[in-house]
Amino acid sequence: MLTVPGLCWLCRMPLALGHWGICSVCSRAARTDKTLCPQCGLPATHSHLPCGRCLQKPPPWQRLVTVADYAPPLSLLIHQLKFSRRSEIASALSRLLLLEVLHARRTTGLQLPDRIISVPLWQRRHWRRGFNQSDLLCQPLSRWLHCQWDSEAITRTRATATQHFLSARLRRRNLKNAFRLELPVQGRHMVIVDDVVTTGSTVAEIAQLLLRNGAATVQVWCLCRTL
């Protein structure tokens, strides 16, 4: 997918503001039309009430905000961001996430956070890639929402196996005690930002760490939730 300055990257129509990257029509079209549970982000009957899964076994976070399923066109843009070093895509993707957050605030009273945090990469992977995609999403979000962000709020204590090929049970085991909190969060309303949430094992481990250290609430914001 070629990105052309001044044109929408998806429909190729001229942009009113060239740096946005994605036009308002495509931004609206990128959103999922499925009814999602406000807590786990999976398909549900109601978008304002927790689903049966969350009532029986709630995740360790209170809200999950997502733009869409992990499918084209968003999946293609995320892949380019992560693996083709197209860091200019990050701002446009952050804007899509911002619009979804503001929509949730208008329609469901979503609470804005005191601080947002990135899902960290292991040092070697960060060095190889040259950036952490979660950092690139957090940076403009923190500026637009006037909340705190520190790229080193959470660090990885060890290397972990690639999650993609692991079952949900092995993912949880793989991530056990893999993160360390580097700053106080007592009484703070926290948001974990990631590009894609699949089983939720990574964000669940971080959410549990935040809650153990006194965070008042934890939300998860992601571009894509595997539905």
Curated annotation (Swiss-Prot):
InterPro entries from the UniProt entry: ComF/GntX_DNA_util-trans, Competence_ComF, PRibTrfase_dom, PRTase-like
Highest taxon of the lineage: Bacteria
Signal peptide as annotated in the record: none
Gene3D superfamilies on file: 3.40.50.2020
Database matches in Pfam families: Pribosyltran (PF00156)
Family that this chain belongs to: Belongs to the ComF/GntX family.
Function: Could be involved in gluconate metabolism.
Protein name: DNA utilization protein YhgH
Gene name of the record: gntX
